[in-house]
Amino acid sequence: MGKIIGIDLGTTNSCVAVMQGTQPTVIENSEGYRTTPSMVAFTKNGERLIGHAAKRQAITNAKNTVFSIKRFMGRKFDEVPNEKKIAPYKVVNINGEARVEIDDKNYSPQEISAMILQKMKQTAEDFLGEKVTEAVITVPAYFNDAQRQATKDAGKIAGLEVKRIINEPTAAALAYGLDKKKENEKVAVFDLGGGTFDISILELGDGVFEVKSTDGDTHLGGDDFDQTIIDFLADEFKKQEGIDLRTDAIALQRLKEAAEKAKIELSSRTDTEINLPFITATQEGPKHLVVNLTRAKFEALASTLFDNIMAPCKRAIKNAKVNISEIDEVVLVGGSTRIPKVQELVKELFKREPNKSVNPDEVVAVGAAIQGGVLTGEVSDVLLLDVTPLSLGIETLGGVMTKLIEANTTIPTKKQEVFSTAADNQTSVEVHVLQGERPMASDNKTLGRFHLGDIPPAPRGMPQVEVAFDIDANGILHVSAKDKATGKEQSIRIEAGGKLNDAEIEKMKNDAKAHAEEDAKRKEEVETKNAADSLIFSTEKQLQELGDKIPADKKAPLESALDRLKEAHKSGSADAIKPAMDEVNTIWNDIASQLYQAADAPGSGTPNPEAESGKQESSGKTDGQVDAEYEVIDGNDKDK
């Protein structure tokens, strides 16, 4: 088996490493650098430049130099409004997909990323002196299925078989913990890179790297800190000269480079001067930009970003079920962790000095190389247990989301559950796949839909449809539905078009907390309405089957109570439905008692509708009713 290289495909910079014996080695590129700018440029003579060569000519060729393409990976055109606005290159809509247009030719984000991956592949081949065809590529822990699939596609375009997609903070933990002998060490990996932020809590011990929880924001990174400085400079210049530099691609690129340089300088200095002569020109002559920026001013400009860092950290700690005092180390990963304010916030939250023993620019690629070594057998006694960041489920009766796989579940994993039809002679069901944390389906993200047909006609509740969710080691989801009677099966692999974007992920979790009370009330109303629907169905069925066996003096009150329940059901109010259900159940209990006495055979009478619909339903619980077209047959069928 050949070498499996490890690639950190970053927003700002990329890095490649490989196992050399028992140790990982970061590989220098042809220019002698250990990291490569994630930039691709197209020159007027048709030449394609990648990495440092692209960065050197970015100012003079701004419209044809592509950077931060990672932020477009696996996302629709209408999901990237902010990215489009700040990019000097042209982003166009091709059938709903975001594409980069260069000289009337369109490139997908996967194609641009593949060009960067090809550079990393060539770097490794030059170092090893042999062809490289396999790689482990890292992604932010909070990348969704579409973004992960897009990354795999980019690897394929680059001529690489992607053996594994692993999360960046997990890769960093592998690199940090490979030679650590301490058992059961709890580590927080704080990964703030060029475009994304991840926080993962892991437990390391005896070669096992177990992720306890992960959280983050796929729209928070060095680019966003740069943008605060860019906007500040542009606004200051507009005040002074009345010209918006953001409308000029070349000026915007100069602002970007100056902002990045200023941010870096402010990590070691308290102030810096930004001097951009001849930034633009008017009829009056050339204009120059000279601004002094202090560290305090920068921290004020980026205060919202700093605030946004803390919330995911607190959620990750809570979800990992650990106390801050139990965390042994906080490992800093990503170039943006060099910002003093970031380090200050980390120290303040975790009550300890952050661990700076790893190279924040290289550690992720090193971890990917170690994972490659695990796959080839070069590295033994290492077990990696990662997690899925968000819950996955399907839409169920009344528009409720029923979770099959909870957030922070260890992957790979598979979960199965058996459902049934909700109507007589129903011959097909729809599986509506969802991702998110809200109780109601409409508040979560649709990943896909598919139908299972040709179900033999039968009374409702009879057919058994097994729905299975399967997340592979790359974090990519596969869903299937199977009619257990006929063996007919339908499946779907979630494609890149229908996935969550970064803002939606963060919004889901924030909304879940902000609207918890409202969600609980809505869910209770739906569950109560579902229970009433089942009770109405059962009552009408019993009335028809028992007919004249029901005493006349009881039948009329029952029918009246049933009518009141139907009216309450129409209102959708749980407060109205519950007493109406209690009234119907009380009358039915009385009727059932009389029927048993008449038959002189206790226990041989016909069960009342309350028993048929289940005590769970009369109390507002509907675990037995789970889809607009499904209900669970038997709790014992779950988790097969």
From Swiss-Prot:
One of its GO terms (molecular function) is ATP-dependent protein folding chaperone. Keywords: ATP-binding, Chaperone, Nucleotide-binding, Phosphoprotein, Stress response. Gene3D superfamilies: 1.20.1270.10, 3.30.420.40, Actin, Chain A, domain 4, Substrate Binding Domain Of DNAk, Chain A, domain 1. The modification Phosphothreonine is found at T196. Residues 510-530, 598-640 are annotated as: Disordered. Induction: By stress conditions e.g. heat shock. Belongs to the heat shock protein 70 family. NCBIfam families: PRK00290.1, PRK05183.1, prok_dnaK. This is Chaperone protein DnaK. It comes from Prosthecochloris aestuarii (strain DSM 271 / SK 413).
